[in-house]
Amino acid sequence: MNLQKKKPTPEEIIRIQKSYYDAGSNVVLSNTFGANGLKFDDEELEQLVTAAVKNAREAARQSSGTQEKFVALDIGPLGKLLKPYGDYEFEDAVAMYAKTVKFGVAAGVDLVFIETMNDSYDTKAALLAVKENTDLPVFVSNAYGADGKLMTGASPAAMVAMLEGMHADAIGANCSLGPDQLVGVVEEYLEYASVPVLLKPNAGLPRAENGKTVYDVFPPEFSESVGKLLEKGVRIAGGCCGTTPDYIRAVVEKSKSITPVPVTEKNLSLVSSYTHAVKFGESPILIGERINPTGKKRFQQALRENDIDYILGEALKQQDAGVQLLDVNVGLPEIDEPAFLLRAVRELQAVTDLPLQLDTTDPVAMEAGLRAYNGKAMVNSVNGKGLSHHRQ
């Protein structure tokens, strides 16, 4: 017996997407959630993405809805854990995402929607691929667990710091939980974010019933819960797993009676690691300065001998002493500072979750360190003379 799942036809996909436009959706995502270079060769990927965008565009054309309609390129996780949690390289992930982005842009999408990301580093790779290949708007949505954190530990505040630092146009949460379970996550986004906050919850929690997956929240309750979060300040709302067009229709109707809350500039100074954010301005912040060769002969020796273990040991000592940030300076005239700072950033974030302060006057080294950093780093020693910050 052939148990291979039947692939949907273009007509079936168009019908489904049209039903969401008919329900009042402004944005419908292309059928490309799992489309990436790890699963398809370049020719297959281009054909798949091009067809998916064409189908969504046709669904918008056929829809009876009179609202503005947009097609978003849907990008989901690669399905690989990046180092240090897994064995996949960060730059390889950027390259894989870039392929999908390029094909989607060429096919004529209106925006890019990165969603259901459960790892901050994977999220950064996807957003970097978008930013390096298009000027289209990009929305970024992460999948949080019941503990209010991503699978690899990031808090909403940490994601706000990093994603705003990379100029995402809207940020928020989707999948994994229903709207009531995501209230705490959404409130943290609203506390820190200066860009629109988005929300696409599941239709509650799934369970198996007669061999099928069903959900425990129905359209009236769903729209009521989402409506309360719209009143708190969420500006973009939709649905994820289990949300049929009836759910979207209910949310659209509910939103008509709600006055949108203005998006406000929070004027916060945040830095972050892959787990948490640190806010400046309320109380003194303790920054460890031991990872610095100035006046430290033993540290200088470690740099010359490529002794990364000594540097990691200094980081852990300072963490145990209670510092909140780690300054990282590996500048010596005789070493390759860009290469060593890149290595130091990678190795440090594998052993500590303290945010890093990258300390260098070399713009090439700074760029390498910031690119590899899993969070939003603090920048030190860059001055305003000439073009010292031209690459930052």
Give the label of every model feature segment.
Residues M1-Q392:
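Domain-level signal for soluble alpha/beta catalytic cores
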